């Protein structure tokens, strides 16, 4: 019996100081789908290890591989970087040191605003919105990246 290669996907990340939202593409890399939220640890290194373990478990469960990771870079409206953008860059560097998967930073300006607006329109309670806003933001970041590839 022939071993079929595992389908590959692209992973989207919305990094936050307390939570990280994850989204993934479909096999054709056209549509972004929300996945899960990972809570951060006190130290960045611990968060990266926890995230890689989570990604590994997801890949095992879904029998897929991640070919690329897209991390939202929160630029200011002027295009300049601020404190959180510097934290994202540091996080991306730590992640790249521990995985051979290529990592790309992607402009995420206003994605959280867009996610919150979409969730308000969906009639979810504030409590439910707060639980999913990070994965919806990750999906928006990833979808923007996927759309740019067409």
UniProtKB/Swiss-Prot annotation:
Record GO biological process: rRNA 5'-end processing
One matching Pfam family: RuvX
Domain of life: Bacteria
Compartments in which it is found: Cytoplasm
EC number(s) recorded for this UniProt protein: 3.1.-.-
Keyword list, A-Z: Cytoplasm, Hydrolase, Nuclease, Ribosome biogenesis
Gene3D superfamilies per the UniProt record, alphabetical: YqgF/RNase H-like domain (3.30.420.140)
A GO molecular-function annotation: nuclease activity
First-level EC class: hydrolase
This protein's GO CC annotations: cytosol
Primary location recorded for the protein, binned into one broad class: cytoplasm
InterPro entries found in the cross-reference section: RNaseH-like_sf (IPR012337), YqgF (IPR005227), YqgF/RNaseH-like_dom (IPR006641), YqgF/RNaseH-like_dom_sf (IPR037027)
Entry similarity comment: Belongs to the YqgF nuclease family.
Function: Could be a nuclease involved in processing of the 5'-end of pre-16S rRNA.
Name of the protein: Putative pre-16S rRNA nuclease
Organism: Protochlamydia amoebophila (strain UWE25)
Taxonomic lineage: Bacteria, Pseudomonadati, Chlamydiota, Chlamydiia, Parachlamydiales
